[in-house]
């Protein structure tokens, strides 16, 4: 038995060496992202212990003493903080509204582009919709401020129609529509790439069979196109649910004013203020840890539902 086990071990070793020699360039390509994730994603995870420590910069993370209540001091503070639940609610509402509106947009655009027969027009539309993705958040918010301020083009049009000007930038009720609208404009074209790629892999014989059965464009879309890209849609939805607790704090900070803070203050901006501005690192880490656990819960539940109702899931 010992000889058999040793022989199997040698066989596995030889196969690994041969596979490595055969695909050495692929392994080399894989090495760079592997190193990136180890250094910038996994290695910093030890910083999560800040949530359970009385952090002192002079002592560092490892040298700082554990917090009171068996290390749960800051976790309990987060749970008992009424304002945390306010920003938690703002984050959930903003991201759910954003998901409901922005998630279908690239799918619809991809389906529309897929029906365009004129190749040049299709490329122009794709280029125009891709470009906003490459604009920085500062530029996008600056454009919004120029367009929607009291003397901007939008209020000029409203005034020319005999209506009162609207304070878009400071009125809390307009914050979410402006945030979501800018997200659609900035991301819809780029997100379309994934769905266009999925559409390009569909079997054209299915469309031919649908035409023979008398299906028009609409029925082909309903019964061939959408079912064909449904696995991609499900995977993208699961990944989107994992980001439901994450909001780009750069855009929020740039759009936030004293009058709209009641709806614009979210977890990421709250963590920024407590961690960076007030140097309350342990509390900010505890908030971030709670945020990550909720995101994991959303992904797990969505993946479980997907696995039970379809054959597509992340794991």
Each language-model region and where it sits:
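Short, Lys/Arg-rich, polar N-terminal cytosolic tail immediately upstream
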Residues: 1-19
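A structural signal for multi-pass alpha-helical bundles of membrane permease subunits
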Residues: 19-315
């Amino acid at each position: 038995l010992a000889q058999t086990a040793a022989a199997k071990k040698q066989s596995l070793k030889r196969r690994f060496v041969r596979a490595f020699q055969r695909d050495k360039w692929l392994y080399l390509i894989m090495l760079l992202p592997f190193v990136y994730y180890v250094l910038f994603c996994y290695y910093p995870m030890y910083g999560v212990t800040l949530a359970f420590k009385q952090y002192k910069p002079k002592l560092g993370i490892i040298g700082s003493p554990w917090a009171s209540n068996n290390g749960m001091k800051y976790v309990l503070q987060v749970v008992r903080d009424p304002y945390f639940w306010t920003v938690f609610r703002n984050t959930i509402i903003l991201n759910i509204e954003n998901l409901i509106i922005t998630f279908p947009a690239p799918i619809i655009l991809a389906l529309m582009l897929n029906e365009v027969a004129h190749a040049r027009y299709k490329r122009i539309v794709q280029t125009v919709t891709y470009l906003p993705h490459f604009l920085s958040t500062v530029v996008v918010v600056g454009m919004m401020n120029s367009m929607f301020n009291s003397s901007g083009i939008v209020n000029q049009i409203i005034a020319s129609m005999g209506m009162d000007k609207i304070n878009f930038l400071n009125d809390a009720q307009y914050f979410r529509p402006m945030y979501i609208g800018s997200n659609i404009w900035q991301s819809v074209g780029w997100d379309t790439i994934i769905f266009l790629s999925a559409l390009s892999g569909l079997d054209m014989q299915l469309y031919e069979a649908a035409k023979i059965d008398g299906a028009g464009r609409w029925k082909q879309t309903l019964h061939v196109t959408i079912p064909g890209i449904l696995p991609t849609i499900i995977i993208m939805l699961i990944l989107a649910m994992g980001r439901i607790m994450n909001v780009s704090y750069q855009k929020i900070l740039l759009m936030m004013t004293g009058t709209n803070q009641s709806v614009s203050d979210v977890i990421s901006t709250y963590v920024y203020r407590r961690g960076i501005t007030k140097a309350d690192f342990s509390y900010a880490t505890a908030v971030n840890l709670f945020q990550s656990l909720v995101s994991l819960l959303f992904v797990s539940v969505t993946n479980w539902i997907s696995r039970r109702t379809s054959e597509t899931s992340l794991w």
